[in-house]
Amino acid sequence: MYAVFQSGGKQHRVSEGQTIRLEKLDIATGETIEFDQVLMIANGEEINIGAPLVDGGKIKAEIIAHGRGEKIKIVKFRRRKHYRKQQGHRQWFTDVKITGISA
C-alpha cells in the first residue's frame, strides 16, 4: 500500500514505515501529525485517485527530528569588473516516519 500526498509545496510518494524528509514543520519532536492533502492511495490492484484530493484520505506520521541540510554556495561573478559575491544557505528540514495510511 502506498499513497501520494502534498506537503510544503511538494508531492511525496510514501508507504507505511517509510522515513522521509520534508520542509520544516513547526511541530515538536516525538509528536504525531496527520496529513489530509492526499492525492492518491493505492492498495494492491485498487487505486483511488482524488480530484484533486481523496475524500477521507489521511496519512499519519511521527516527527523524528529537525535539522538543517548541507550548505550550498551561491556565487555571483562579473568578469573584468572586480565583482565577486558569495553567499551560503542551509535549508531547514523535518524527518518524519509514516505510521499509517487510511482512505
From Swiss-Prot:
Keywords: Ribonucleoprotein, Ribosomal protein, RNA-binding, rRNA-binding. InterPro entries: bL21-like, bL21-like_sf, Ribosomal_bL21, Ribosomal_bL21_CS. GO terms for molecular function: rRNA binding; structural constituent of ribosome. It holds the Pfam family Ribosomal_L21p. The keyword NADP does not apply. Belongs to the bacterial ribosomal protein bL21 family. Part of the 50S ribosomal subunit. Contacts protein L20. This is Large ribosomal subunit protein bL21. It comes from Yersinia pestis. The gene is rplU.
